[in-house]
C-alpha cells in the first residue's frame, strides 16, 4: 500500500470542510500505545497516519482572501493556487473530498505515476480540479462530463491552466454509455490513464459507467479512482467492476470513508 508524504502548509481550510478537519486533526499516539499487542499497535498507527494525511489533504482547500461577486473556492497543488467556480445546486459542479484525495495522490506520487506527456482522460470531471492538477503535472488531458456542466468546466480549466500547462487541456462531452463508438472510437483511445473521483453514488447509470470504463481502456491503461463509500450499492459496483478489471486498493482513508484504487483491464484470454 502506498503511503503519502506529508507536506507543510499554512493554508486555512474552507468552512465546508471544517467539520472534517475537527474529526481528522493531527494527534499524538496514546501513551498506552506501546502496551498494546502488535495487531492493536498497527491499527492505532494506521488511524494516526490516516488522520495526519487527511488533515494535510483538506488543508489544500483555503478561504479566499478577497471577497468578490463571483463565488469560488481556492486550492493549492503543484505550487499553484487553483481557483474553482462551483454550483452548489448541482452534484457535478461541486468539489468533493474524493477529488482532493486524488489530486493529493497525483502530486505526492508524481514519480511513480508520471503524468508528463501522458494521455489522460477524466470521466465525471465536474469542476475540473483533478484535470487541472493532471495538466499542471504535464499531461495531455481530456476532461469530460455531461453537456450542462461543460461551460463551467471549460471556464475553470482555462483560467487555471493557461500559460501554466505544458499541453492545452481539452474539454469534451461524455454521457456514460452514450455514443461511445462515435465520440470515442476504440481505434483512437490511447489513454495512459483514466482518472475518476466520486463517480459512483446513488445514480441510475452505474452500468453505463462500467461500460464507459471498459470502452475507454486498453490493456495498458491504468485507472486511478477515488471512491467514497456511502451505501451497499457502492460495494456491488466494485464487485461488478472486478469482473472486468484487476483492482488494487492503494490507499484508504477510513475517517472519510474513501478508498483509492488502481485498476487495469483483465487479460480476457486468461479469464
Swiss-Prot record:
Keyword S-adenosyl-L-methionine, does the record have it? yes
Q: Which residues bind S-adenosyl-L-methionine?
A: 96, 124-126, 145, 176, 197
Look up the EC number in the record and give it: 2.1.1.-
Q: Which GO terms describe its molecular function?
A: protein methyltransferase activity
A biological process term (GO) from this entry: methylation
Into which EC class is this enzyme placed? transferase
The Gene Ontology CC terms held by the record are: protein-containing complex
Disulfide bridge partners, by residue number: none
* InterPro entries, per the entry: Methyltransf_16, SAM-dependent_MTases_sf
Entry annotated with the keyword Transferase: yes
Q: CDD domains of this UniProt entry?
A: AdoMet_MTases
Q: Which SUPFAM superfamilies match?
A: S-adenosyl-L-methionine-dependent methyltransferases
Q: Which Gene3D superfamilies match?
A: Vaccinia Virus protein VP39 (3.40.50.150)
Q: Which Pfam families match?
A: Methyltransf_16 (PF10294)
Entry keyword set: Methyltransferase, S-adenosyl-L-methionine, Transferase
Q: Where is the secretion signal located?
A: none
Relate the protein's function as given in its record: Protein-lysine methyltransferase.
Q: Which family does it belong to?
A: Belongs to the methyltransferase superfamily. METTL21 family.
Q: What is this protein called?
A: Putative methyltransferase-like protein 21E pseudogene
Source organism of this protein record = Homo sapiens
The gene behind this protein is METTL21EP
Amino acid at each position: 500500500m502506498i503511503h503519502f508524504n506529508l507536506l507543510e502548509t499554512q493554508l486555512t481550510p474552507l468552512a465546508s470542510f471544517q467539520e472534517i478537519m475537527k474529526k481528522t486533526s493531527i494527534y499524538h499516539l496514546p501513551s498506552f500505545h506501546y502496551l498494546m499487542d502488535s495487531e492493536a499497535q498497527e491499527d492505532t498507527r494506521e488511524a494516526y497516519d490516516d488522520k495526519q494525511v487527511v488533515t494535510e489533504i483538506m488543508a489544500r482547500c483555503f478561504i479566499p482572501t478577497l471577497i468578490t461577486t463571483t463565488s469560488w473556492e481556492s486550492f493549492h497543488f503543484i505550487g499553484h493556487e487553483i481557483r474553482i467556480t462551483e454550483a452548489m445546486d448541482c452534484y457535478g459542479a461541486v468539489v468533493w473530498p474524493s477529488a482532493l484525495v486524488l489530486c493529493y495522490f497525483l502530486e505526492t506520487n508524481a514519480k511513480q505515476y508520471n503524468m508528463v506527456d501522458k494521455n489522460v482522460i477524466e470521466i465525471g470531471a465536474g469542476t475540473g480540479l483533478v484535470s487541472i492538477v493532471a495538466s499542471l503535472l504535464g499531461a495531455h488531458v481530456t476532461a469530460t462530463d455531461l453537456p450542462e456542466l461543460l461551460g463551467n468546466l471549460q471556464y475553470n480549466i482555462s483560467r487555471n491552466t493557461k500559460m501554466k500547462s505544458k499541453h492545452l487541456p481539452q474539454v469534451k462531452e461524455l454521457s456514460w454509455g452514450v455514443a461511445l463508438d462515435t465520440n470515442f472510437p476504440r481505434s483512437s483511445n490511447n489513454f495512459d490513464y483514466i482518472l475518476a473521483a466520486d463517480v459512483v453514488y446513488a445514480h441510475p447509470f452505474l452500468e453505463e459507467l462500467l461500460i464507459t470504463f471498459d470502452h475507454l481502456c486498453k490493456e495498458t491503461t491504468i485507472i486511478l479512482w477515488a471512491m467514497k463509500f456511502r451505501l451497499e450499492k457502492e460495494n456491488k459496483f466494485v464487485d461488478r467492476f472486478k469482473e472486468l478489471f484487476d483492482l488494487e486498493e492503494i490507499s484508504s482513508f477510513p475517517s472519510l470513508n474513501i478508498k483509492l484504487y488502481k485498476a487495469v483491464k483483465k487479460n480476457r484470454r486468461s479469464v
